[in-house]
Amino acid sequence: MSSDWDTNTVIGQRVRTGGSGPRQQVARTQGQINAARRAGLVLSVDKKYASSNTKANNEGQRLTMVDRETDIVKPKKLDPSVGRAIAKGRGDKGMTQKDLATRINEKPTVINDYEAGRAIPNQQILAKMERALGVKLRGKGIGEPLGGPKKK
Protein backbone atom coordinates (compact mmCIF):
# COMPACT_ATOMS: atom_id res chain seq x y z
CA MET A 1 0.00 0.00 0.00
CA SER A 2 2.62 2.50 -1.08
CA SER A 3 1.74 5.75 -2.76
CA ASP A 4 3.70 8.70 -4.13
CA TRP A 5 3.10 10.50 -0.84
CA ASP A 6 4.97 7.78 1.05
CA THR A 7 8.13 7.87 -1.07
CA ASN A 8 10.91 10.39 -1.16
CA THR A 9 13.21 10.28 -4.22
CA VAL A 10 16.63 11.95 -3.99
CA ILE A 11 18.30 13.12 -7.20
CA GLY A 12 22.06 13.68 -7.54
CA GLN A 13 25.29 11.73 -8.18
CA ARG A 14 26.86 12.19 -4.77
CA VAL A 15 26.53 14.37 -1.74
CA ARG A 16 27.80 17.82 -2.57
CA THR A 17 31.20 18.70 -1.13
CA GLY A 18 32.31 22.29 -0.84
CA GLY A 19 30.55 25.04 -2.76
CA SER A 20 30.47 23.45 -6.21
CA GLY A 21 28.87 20.47 -7.87
CA PRO A 22 25.29 19.49 -8.46
CA ARG A 23 22.93 19.90 -5.56
CA GLN A 24 21.06 16.98 -4.11
CA GLN A 25 17.31 17.53 -4.51
CA VAL A 26 14.07 15.81 -3.75
CA ALA A 27 11.90 14.92 -6.73
CA ARG A 28 8.33 16.09 -6.38
CA THR A 29 6.77 14.72 -9.58
CA GLN A 30 6.94 11.46 -11.49
CA GLY A 31 8.37 13.40 -14.45
CA GLN A 32 11.35 14.58 -12.41
CA ILE A 33 12.01 11.02 -11.24
CA ASN A 34 11.88 9.69 -14.82
CA ALA A 35 14.20 12.45 -16.09
CA ALA A 36 16.68 11.68 -13.31
CA ARG A 37 16.54 7.94 -14.07
CA ARG A 38 17.29 8.61 -17.76
CA ALA A 39 20.29 10.67 -16.71
CA GLY A 40 21.33 8.01 -14.17
CA LEU A 41 21.04 10.40 -11.24
CA VAL A 42 18.53 8.64 -8.94
CA LEU A 43 20.31 7.99 -5.67
CA SER A 44 17.60 6.57 -3.45
CA VAL A 45 13.90 6.23 -2.95
CA ASP A 46 13.19 6.64 0.76
CA LYS A 47 9.92 6.02 2.54
CA LYS A 48 8.45 8.90 4.49
CA TYR A 49 7.53 7.97 8.02
CA ALA A 50 4.44 9.29 9.74
CA SER A 51 5.02 12.45 11.73
CA SER A 52 4.36 12.78 15.43
CA ASN A 53 1.10 14.69 15.11
CA THR A 54 -0.71 12.06 13.04
CA LYS A 55 -2.77 9.34 14.61
CA ALA A 56 -4.98 6.54 13.37
CA ASN A 57 -8.65 7.32 12.93
CA ASN A 58 -10.67 4.28 13.94
CA GLU A 59 -14.05 5.83 13.13
CA GLY A 60 -13.83 4.77 9.48
CA GLN A 61 -13.05 1.19 10.51
CA ARG A 62 -16.05 1.15 12.84
CA LEU A 63 -18.36 2.53 10.14
CA THR A 64 -17.10 -0.08 7.66
CA MET A 65 -17.71 -2.83 10.19
CA VAL A 66 -21.24 -1.55 10.86
CA ASP A 67 -21.81 -1.28 7.09
CA ARG A 68 -20.81 -4.89 6.46
CA GLU A 69 -22.98 -6.34 9.20
CA THR A 70 -26.11 -8.03 7.92
CA ASP A 71 -28.28 -7.64 11.00
CA ILE A 72 -29.70 -4.26 11.99
CA VAL A 73 -28.51 -3.00 15.37
CA LYS A 74 -30.85 -0.66 17.21
CA PRO A 75 -29.24 2.05 19.33
CA LYS A 76 -29.75 1.64 23.07
CA LYS A 77 -32.86 3.37 24.38
CA LEU A 78 -33.57 4.53 27.89
CA ASP A 79 -35.49 2.18 30.17
CA PRO A 80 -39.03 3.47 30.92
CA SER A 81 -38.36 3.14 34.67
CA VAL A 82 -35.67 5.83 34.36
CA GLY A 83 -38.16 8.23 32.75
CA ARG A 84 -40.67 7.57 35.54
CA ALA A 85 -37.95 8.11 38.18
CA ILE A 86 -37.00 11.46 36.58
CA ALA A 87 -40.64 12.60 36.50
CA LYS A 88 -41.22 11.49 40.12
CA GLY A 89 -38.02 13.13 41.39
CA ARG A 90 -38.88 16.32 39.53
CA GLY A 91 -42.41 16.31 40.98
CA ASP A 92 -41.12 15.76 44.52
CA LYS A 93 -38.87 18.81 44.20
CA GLY A 94 -41.68 20.86 42.58
CA MET A 95 -39.69 21.52 39.40
CA THR A 96 -40.93 21.78 35.83
CA GLN A 97 -39.04 20.24 32.92
CA LYS A 98 -37.81 23.73 32.05
CA ASP A 99 -36.54 24.31 35.62
CA LEU A 100 -34.62 21.02 35.59
CA ALA A 101 -33.23 21.79 32.13
CA THR A 102 -31.89 25.20 33.18
CA ARG A 103 -30.45 23.68 36.36
CA ILE A 104 -28.39 21.10 34.46
CA ASN A 105 -27.65 23.36 31.43
CA GLU A 106 -29.63 21.32 28.91
CA LYS A 107 -32.61 22.06 26.66
CA PRO A 108 -36.14 21.24 27.88
CA THR A 109 -36.57 18.90 24.89
CA VAL A 110 -33.72 16.76 26.26
CA ILE A 111 -35.55 16.37 29.59
CA ASN A 112 -38.76 15.55 27.71
CA ASP A 113 -36.98 12.87 25.64
CA TYR A 114 -35.46 11.29 28.77
CA GLU A 115 -38.82 11.21 30.57
CA ALA A 116 -40.56 9.71 27.52
CA GLY A 117 -37.80 7.08 27.12
CA ARG A 118 -36.92 8.26 23.58
CA ALA A 119 -33.42 9.48 24.37
CA ILE A 120 -30.21 7.55 23.79
CA PRO A 121 -28.65 7.39 27.27
CA ASN A 122 -25.79 9.81 27.89
CA GLN A 123 -23.89 9.19 31.13
CA GLN A 124 -22.98 12.87 31.61
CA ILE A 125 -26.58 14.06 31.34
CA LEU A 126 -27.81 11.25 33.61
CA ALA A 127 -25.16 12.17 36.20
CA LYS A 128 -26.23 15.84 36.12
CA MET A 129 -29.88 14.84 36.55
CA GLU A 130 -29.00 12.52 39.45
CA ARG A 131 -27.25 15.34 41.29
CA ALA A 132 -30.02 17.88 40.57
CA LEU A 133 -32.87 15.54 41.60
CA GLY A 134 -31.09 13.56 44.32
CA VAL A 135 -32.38 10.30 42.79
CA LYS A 136 -30.43 7.34 41.36
CA LEU A 137 -30.96 6.97 37.61
CA ARG A 138 -28.21 4.47 36.74
CA GLY A 139 -27.26 0.99 37.85
CA LYS A 140 -29.19 -0.90 40.53
CA GLY A 141 -31.94 0.73 42.55
CA ILE A 142 -33.21 3.24 39.99
CA GLY A 143 -35.48 5.76 41.74
CA GLU A 144 -33.89 5.39 45.17
CA PRO A 145 -32.59 8.50 46.97
CA LEU A 146 -29.03 9.33 46.09
CA GLY A 147 -26.66 8.72 49.01
CA GLY A 148 -24.27 11.49 49.98
CA PRO A 149 -20.51 11.22 49.75
CA LYS A 150 -19.05 8.05 51.27
CA LYS A 151 -17.78 8.28 54.83
CA LYS A 152 -14.12 7.51 55.39
UniProtKB/Swiss-Prot annotation:
Alphabetized InterPro entries for the sequence: Cro/C1-type_HTH, Lambda_DNA-bd_dom_sf, MBF1_N
DNA-binding region: 97-116
Biased composition (Polar residues): 1-11, 22-32
Ranges of residues in domain HTH cro/C1-type: 86-140
SMART domains xrefs: HTH_XRE (SM00530)
GO biological process: one example: GCN2-mediated signaling
Keywords: Activator, DNA-binding, Transcription, Transcription regulation
Listed GO MF terms: DNA binding; ribosome binding
Gene Ontology CC: one annotated term: cytoplasm
Segments of this protein annotated with the region Disordered: 1-32
Protein family: Belongs to the MBF1 family.
Function of the molecule: Transcriptional coactivator that stimulates GCN4-dependent transcriptional activity by bridging the DNA-binding region of GCN4 and TBP (SPT15), thereby recruiting TBP to GCN4-bound promoters. Involved in induction of the ribosome quality control (RQC) pathway; a pathway that degrades nascent peptide chains during problematic translation. Required to prevent stalled ribosomes from frameshifting.
Protein name: Multiprotein-bridging factor 1
Species of the source: Eremothecium gossypii (strain ATCC 10895 / CBS 109.51 / FGSC 9923 / NRRL Y-1056) (Yeast)
